[in-house]
């Protein structure tokens, strides 16, 4: 039964769904990126245009296309605005990537054991698993890239898939801008390498490419028409969009090996097999002209090489090639193992996945792979901030940075934390100028203030991490009455 394709697909889909969505109802959302994207998704349907992603009501950020926020916004409509809803689409796309990895490997190599191992390699170690449990954009991008690549290879057999290839690539661009063009770049190189100009000038392939450009570039066009050069400057000319930044290259040319070092640290136990597999697939591509090897080798090598020149080298940006890594690793191992060894390994893989499902869903174990409680103290604080401030009112900041805990506070309280005040004298001066203002600080900082300025401060709410306070002159305006008051969901 374990070798049955139907069983393996159902087991992988059901198990990954339980792993990615398990223990999410009360886990909370993370700072920085997770809460930042969750706020944008909350505002996408209330902004002036669906094409303009706002943050705390402002359009000064043009860093992200809107498709992930549309999807999460729809989930908010169904489940309400919460941390669970914020991670829901990432989890579902993670499940779909697991399924596509299995299906693509089975389509290429017609072997259930290799396909199951490919999905297993994708899940473990926990890099991909961890991100599928977060409200990030990388898993959404990885899904559209994987779906696009799947349709590209299917297009060799049935050219109707080229249109779907283009649509998925366009959605990848609408998810994470220029990174979404990788399927088109890979597609052109693969089609030329495999079949020459005749394949490139295939009408349906070109129609798919055209569709990807129309869909993907629609956001660029709309925002350029609305905001002009402001959009160009704040999207395309920001530091994180640069390739081969001059200062990095001149000071340390070895920075281009950053991703390789990250893989060496984090991609165990598969790293040696994956490296050997990439070499073997490259050899098969150049010597034997095997189209499957060409396809998978280009899928991993083009993004890896190009992204290695980028300013921001974060391993999650490469999740788009992890399905190909899984297939290459699985096929390489399958060629090294005997059939009896494969039969013995399969129950172990099933057992590890089942154990992970149980750990996530029926134990209180707290580990860094997205099983820790996130910002519980701030979630408890958020209703008190919300009820004691007006919608347009900001919270004064003493002792925190510009960005932490700004994003999480903004998501759970719908209020914005101002830039930090760094010294106590300035705080007291501002408190005298605006006694009705409320402040947030670490508990240690608040205790120092109380000691140095007795009878000046009133603590509205405090816990192990945060002190939310105001001037004693404002005490009579503070309320703890939540009757008939709709407060933000703090899950």
Language model features by range: what are they?
Residues 113-118, 154-170, 300:
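Short hydrophobic alpha-helices at membrane interfaces in multi-pass membrane enzymes
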Residues 18-21, 36-60, 67-70, 74, ...:
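Extracytosolic helix-loop segments that constitute the early lumenal/periplasmic catalytic or substrate-binding loops
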Residues 106-109, 148-164, 284, 333:
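Membrane-interface transmembrane helices that cradle and orient dolichyl/undecaprenyl
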Residues 88-109, 147:
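Transmembrane-helix motifs of polytopic, lipid-linked glycan transferases
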Residues 5-13, 101-124:
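Transmembrane-helix signature of polytopic, membrane-embedded enzymes
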Residues 38, 43, 171, 180-292, ...:
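Transmembrane-lumen/periplasm boundary regions of multi-pass, lipid-linked membrane glycan transferases
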Residues 361-476, 486-489:
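Short periplasmic/luminal acceptor-recognition loop of GT-C membrane glycosyltransferases, typified by
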Residues 87, 130-140:
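Short acidic/glycine- and proline-prone juxtamembrane loop motifs at membrane-interface regions
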